């Protein structure tokens, strides 16, 4: 028997639908239930967000709280979306859409819509879209309760034996304005979100506005590698309209166009925020903290400044909440990266070595401001304790509006690698000399750089370590080739003597004949006492 699926696979979608007399809208309706049609375009969505900002915030209606409370972690894990109801499972386009169910951890409903030829129809929630146990509390939810989020699945047109679209997805939106994508190594890791409001701001509770509505543009090209969605953001302090054009190729690249409107003053207005996890790495690890050598989704913040400087700032698990601001004017880009790709440095089946890097690329001038890095103490890998974002210099006041365009690159590395040598490791140890009593308050640093111009340093010539700090004094400063036989692999070594426990900010790069050979290493050192001896009195 020839099914519609067979027909769609053997001919172009437009020809098949025409032959069957089925519109794309009707095709979507065969998989999910749709509401009435209403006009839709991005300009109108922007005006809707603008009008909402002039009105008091109204929290979205949610499903009964007592039912949602029963859909706990265990119950939610037993609810699986039935891919027989996936949006665009038969096309048009190559990437079907599946949905997340509401639960105790995801209570705010997201209204989903499909757009075709300028008309939008809501996708009506129905429990029949999900496989769930007969006694699941989710069966007691009222009709049209909404969804918690959605995923784009891998291509239905690809080799299903290698990458079954029903089991593999490449982007997910779930919770508040959070979303994430896999990189080119097919692994989820850190997250992005639409906006960050008052992160770790003294005297202010952080606000988490929600994407309350999402619209899926019906693809017009059967084999296009991109999808387009629109989203409405709403919260007590902000409204916004978003357009995401998401490309699935080498990793995932998202082009984001957003209009934002403020209901109130925002003390820390975080644009293009990324959230990640860093517990420990080769840099510093407490005795017997964990059996694994390293645990992190990202190991550093990379920045490409408006003046062209390339900067690498290794991440910390600090003793207290720390916020670092790196002032800039029209930054070229920044991102939280996972540079260490060696499994042996993690030894974990969750494959931290495959976690994606996320690079933010402004598509227009962002003016004066700062890349801000928030580091929060953690004692486990289950917490996202790192936030990186752009914060404008001008105050974010009630009534202000912003129009922003930027690109997010979810890749294994930076999309525009520096030609300079890159920092590949930061190692800390006891200061002083082997075999001698170790002086108090002295820490030894070993910073490794690799590649770029270092590969052409003549034999017998040593680069200069250009080193500064906010306080303390340096000693035993020198550079040497790492004795591993790898060309262009060098390290700078030095001791830092410092009193007290206040953080020390350091800056280092390698130079030869007045020219930089490496990117700039920035580091914030939190003095600590090593649990080893002997220590000089």
Curated annotation (Swiss-Prot):
Posttranslational mods: Predicted to be exported by the Tat system. The position of the signal peptide cleavage has not been experimentally proven.
GO molecular function, a single term: carbohydrate binding
Subcellular localization(s) per the UniProt record: Periplasm
InterPro entries, per the entry: Gal_mutarotase_sf_dom, GH-type_carb-bd, Glucan_biosyn_MdoD, Glucan_biosyn_MdoG/MdoD, Glucan_biosyn_MdoG_C, Ig-like_fold, Ig_E-set, TAT_signal
One Pfam family cited in the UniProt record for this chain: MdoG
Biological pathway: Glycan metabolism; osmoregulated periplasmic glucan (OPG) biosynthesis
Signal peptide extent: 1-28
Biological role stated in the UniProt entry: Probably involved in the control of the structural glucose backbone of osmoregulated periplasmic glucans (OPGs).
Family: Belongs to the OpgD/OpgG family.
Protein name per Swiss-Prot or TrEMBL: Glucans biosynthesis protein D 2
Gene expressing this chain: opgD2
């Amino acid at each position: 028997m020839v099914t519609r699926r067979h027909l769609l696979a053997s001919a172009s979608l437009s020809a098949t639908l025409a032959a069957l007399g089925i519109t794309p809208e009707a095709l979507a309706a065969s998989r999910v239930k749709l509401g009435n049609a209403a006009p839709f375009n991005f300009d109108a969505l922007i005006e809707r967000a603008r009008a909402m900002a002039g009105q008091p915030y109204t929290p979205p209606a949610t499903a009964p709280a007592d039912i949602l409370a029963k859909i706990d972690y265990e119950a939610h894990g037993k609810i699986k979306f039935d891919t027989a109801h996936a949006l665009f499972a038969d096309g048009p386009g190559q990437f079907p859409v599946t949905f997340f169910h509401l639960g105790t951890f995801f209570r705010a409903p997201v209204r989903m819509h499909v757009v075709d030829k300028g008309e939008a129809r809501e996708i009506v929630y129905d429990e029949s879209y999900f496989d769930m146990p007969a006694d699941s509390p989710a069966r007691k939810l009222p009709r049209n309760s909404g969804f918690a989020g959605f995923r784009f699945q891998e291509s239905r047109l690809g080799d299903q034996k290698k990458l079954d679209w029903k089991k593999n997805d490449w982007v997910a939106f779930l919770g508040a304005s959070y979303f994430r994508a896999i990189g080119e190594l097919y692994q989820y890791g850190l997250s992005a979100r639409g906006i960050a409001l008052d992160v770790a701001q003294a005297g202010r509770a952080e606000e988490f506005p929600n994407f309350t509505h999402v619209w899926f543009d019906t693809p017009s090209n059967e084999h296009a590698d991109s999808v387009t969605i629109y989203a409405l953001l709403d919260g007590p302090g902000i409204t916004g309209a978003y357009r995401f054009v998401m490309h699935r190729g080498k990793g995932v690249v998202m082009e984001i166009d957003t209009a934002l409107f403020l209901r109130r003053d925002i003390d820390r207005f975080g644009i293009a925020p990324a959230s990640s996890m860093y517990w420990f790495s080769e840099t510093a690890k407490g005795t017997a903290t964990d059996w694994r050598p390293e645990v992190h989704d990202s190991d550093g913040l990379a920045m490409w400044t408006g003046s062209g400087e390339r900067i690498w700032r290794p991440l910390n698990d600090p003793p207290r909440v720390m916020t670092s601001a790196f002032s800039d004017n029209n930054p070229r880009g920044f991102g939280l990266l996972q540079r260490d790709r060696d499994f042996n440095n993690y030894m974990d089946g969750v494959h931290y070595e495959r976690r994606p890097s996320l690079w933010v690329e402004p598509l227009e001038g962002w003016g004066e401001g700062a890349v801000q890095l928030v580091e929060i103490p953690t004692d486990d890998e289950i917490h996202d304790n790192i936030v990186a974002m752009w914060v404008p210099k001008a105050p974010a006041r009630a009534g202000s509006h912003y129009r922003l365009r930027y690109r997010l690159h979810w890749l294994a590395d930076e999309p525009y690698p520096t030609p300079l040598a890159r920092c590949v490791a930061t190692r800390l140890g006891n200061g002083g000399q082997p075999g001698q009593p170790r002086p108090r308050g002295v820490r030894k640093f070993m910073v490794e750089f690799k590649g770029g111009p270092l590969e052409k340093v003549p034999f017998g010539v040593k680069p200069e370590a250009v080193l500064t700090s906010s306080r303390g004094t340096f000693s035993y400063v020198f550079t040497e080739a790492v004795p591993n036989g790898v060309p262009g692999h060098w390290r700078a070594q030095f001791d830092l003597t410092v009193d007290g426990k206040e953080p020390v900010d350091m800056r280092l790069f390698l130079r030869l004949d007045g020219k930089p050979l490496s990117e700039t290493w920035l580091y914030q050192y939190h003095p600590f006492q090593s649990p080893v001896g002997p220590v000089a009195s």
